[in-house]
A protein has these predicted regions:
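C-terminus-biased signal that marks the final domain/tail of proteins
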Residues: 46, 70-73, 88, 97-440
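Short, small-residue-biased leader/transition segments that mark boundaries at the very start
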Residues: 1-2, 441-444, 451
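Structured, non-membrane catalytic/scaffold regions adjacent to prosthetic-group chemistry
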Residues: 6, 10-11, 15-95, 100-102, ...
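Short, solvent-exposed loop/turn segments at secondary-structure junctions
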Residues: 14, 270, 446
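N-terminal short leaders/motifs
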Residues: 20-27, 216-221, 453
């Protein structure tokens, strides 16, 4: 998101490998950055991105972009034309105002209305090119971008589409029930690009959805043997593995430890862009981070996000990335023991930011009416302050977790939330999670499943 409140996210679907053009200039990251700089609306961003690949060539593999402004949300899907062939084939569909959509490393646009110019855009050769390459030979009305350029395989359904299903299932159980057979491989009817949720979603709803591990569904990974005695919803890479000659797999949930950063973008047409555009941003895994507000008018970033003192091989106590990873790596192996301690701090911070939002924006609006520059400075300072305060709280959380759970035993807590210390000054008797009386391995069912045979 930049200062005009246009937001672009992306997910790589790869698609047909023979369509990658290594001579192209514009990769998907460059398309995003340039479009954000040049666009005032989502539709303008689509025009900028497609014009750029037409003129300079497209370097990346298949991409799905979510492009939004305060009034519209679009999904744009794009793939190249092969080595040395400039340009790309693409289609973009507008998401209706009363609907939600999701994408997760698999192309999601199937049939589209070629006559609805207000809600559907596409390259002139999106179908003819597929015919030329032998990917499609039916009627135009039956053409599916996804089927032609990113045919589904087992991984596409179970590792990618399943995450979309879980998102839909959270907000419309009827849709979830309808498409569970598709996710489990018992139906070939694909999910729609978008659905109507059973209620209006809030920012907090979307933040919670980003933390999902299929909890409470048939794909729940907290109850199989891989979850261990502390029901961790995390599995080490790779997703599939072999035992003897048999191949198995673990589920791939929305929230995963391989995440570098996550965000929920909020755009509102009833406010000036400087105030209405908020990027709720966190580093590392969505489940283990704090979504702190960064207003789109900010002219500097918090020091903890800057990377001045850290990189991927250099730890720093001033780096948000490393502090969130430090705490998360403590929690994952002892998840059920420690997650509530983390969640209490996380909820307190995010509730504080959410409850303060109306007041902060009211103050910013008063400033904006008199001096927009001062309003932007005010929101920049607030954005930096919230990010840094979250890191300070997370450092204290990490210190607390080390003490409370040191050496595999759990110290008892006083009613005020501090670690219980008897009058003698020594530690109170410990709770030992390894004792069968307090912890049992629950392996009632397994989602570490056999891969289907290739036959």
């Amino acid at each position: 998101m930049l200062f005009r409140s246009v937001t672009i996210g992306e997910t790589t679907f790869g698609g047909r490998e023979e369509l990658v053009d290594s001579t192209g200039i514009m990769d998907y990251g460059s398309l995003i950055y340039v479009a954000l700089q040049r666009s005032r609306t989502a539709k303008e961003a689509i025009q900028v991105m497609t014009d750029l690949v037409k003129e300079y060539g497209y370097y990346s593999s298949g991409e799905s972009f979510s492009i939004a402004d305060p009034n519209e949300v679009w999904i744009l899907e794009m793939i190249g034309k092969g080595p040395g062939v400039k340009g790309a084939v693409w289609v973009a569909v507008r998401i209706p105002d009363d609907c939600i959509a999701a994408h997760a490393n698999q192309s999601r646009i199937h049939q589209f209305n070629m006559n609805d110019k207000d809600n559907c855009l596409y390259s002139p050769d999106v179908i003819s090119f597929a015919r030329e390459k032998g990917y499609f030979d039916g009627m135009n009305k039956d053409f599916s971008f996804s089927a032609a350029y990113n045919p589904l395989d087992f991984g596409g359904v179970r590792f990618c589409e399943a995450r979309v299903w879980s998102f839909y299932n959270m907000f419309n159980k009827s849709v979830g029930d309808t498409y569970l057979p598709y996710i489990q491989g018992d139906s070939k009817e694909p999910m729609p690009l978008y659905i109507k949720p059973s209620r209006k979603l809030s920012v907090r709803d979307v933040q919670a959805a980003m933390r999902d591990h299929y909890e409470g569904t048939p794909l729940d990974i907290t109850n199989d043997p891989g979850a261990g005695p502390f029901k961790t919803p995390y599995r080490l890479s790779p997703l599939s593995f072999k035992v003897g000659d048999q191949e198995y797999f673990n589920e791939r949930p929305i929230s995963t430890q391989q995440t570098a950063f996550t965000f929920v973008s909020q755009m509102r047409a009833n406010l000036p862009d400087a105030i209405g555009g908020v990027l709720w941003f966190g580093t590392d895994d969505a489940n283990m981070t704090v979504f702190a507000p960064v207003y789109c008018c900010s002219d500097r970033i918090p020091d903890c996000y800057s990377g001045k003192e850290a990189d991927c091989v250099t730890f720093s106590w001033d780096s948000a990335f490393w502090i969130y990873n430090w705490v998360a790596d403590m929690i994952r192996p002892r998840y059920s023991l420690m997650i509530d301690d983390m969640r209490a701090v996380q909820n307190n911070l995010e509730d504080t930011y959410a409850n303060a939002q109306a007041g902060i924006e009211s103050s910013a609006m008063s400033l904006y009416e008199k001096d927009p520059v001062k309003a932007k400075e005010f929101l920049t300072n607030y954005s930096c302050m919230t990010a840094e305060s979250a890191i300070d709280s997370w450092k204290k959380l990490g210190e607390f977790l080390i003490v409370k759970y040191n050496d595999g035993a759990v110290k008892k807590m006083a009613k005020d939330g501090t670690i219980l210390r008897p009058e003698t000054g020594h530690c109170a008797p410990l709770v030992r999670p390894g004792d069968r009386k307090s912890t049992r391995l629950n392996s009632s069912h397994s989602t570490s499943s056999r891969m289907p045979s290739s036959a």
